[in-house]
Amino acid sequence: MIRDINFGGLLNIPCPTIPAEFANWLFVECFDPEASELVFPGRGRIPVTPDSVARIFNLPNKGGKVMYELDVDAINSIQSKYDTIQGSAPKIDQIMEMLKNSKTADEDYLRGWLMIAISTFLCPPTSLAISPRCYPALVDLSAVKKLNWCEFMMNQLKDAAIKINKKNSVRGCILLLVVSFTLFSTCSNTCFADSLDLL
């Protein structure tokens, strides 16, 4: 079911945690959101683009724009489907518990899984709650694989980097930066150009 919407790449991530200080350093000190690159003065640059996201995480890299905004109709639609989602935004733990207790892999399960994927990986908010901004993209599950999730991840990461001085918090998929750097650093200086092509 998850693979049917082209999100199977997220099931193959073997990394349960990331080095927080290192990831924050890459995000705050090295990532240039305007150029969409990790910049290391005197050593080179590593492009971080929607194509990078597609190659690393195998998510959809073409299609329509992912709507990530507060939409009353979408909020009402999602709340009407789940007893646990009423009033304020549900906690991530609540949705995870709902998934654990689910007896069938149906649309409700898939929608809940996507809420978790977006709120913990693709575009984690600064709180421990599911952001209702993700609801518009999840109302019609048949359209999920027709959206450009790679572009969405990059746009959210770049937006977070631009606003980093205004908010004392880090959001966005910084694991992308860690993996991009790791792929680059595993190559020797002799394959500098090849390492850039990988990304």
Regions found by a protein language model. Give the residues of each.
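Long, internal protein-protein interaction and assembly surfaces
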Residues: 35, 45, 62-63, 83-199
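N-terminal leader regions that mediate targeting or early regulatory function
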Residues: 1-107, 114
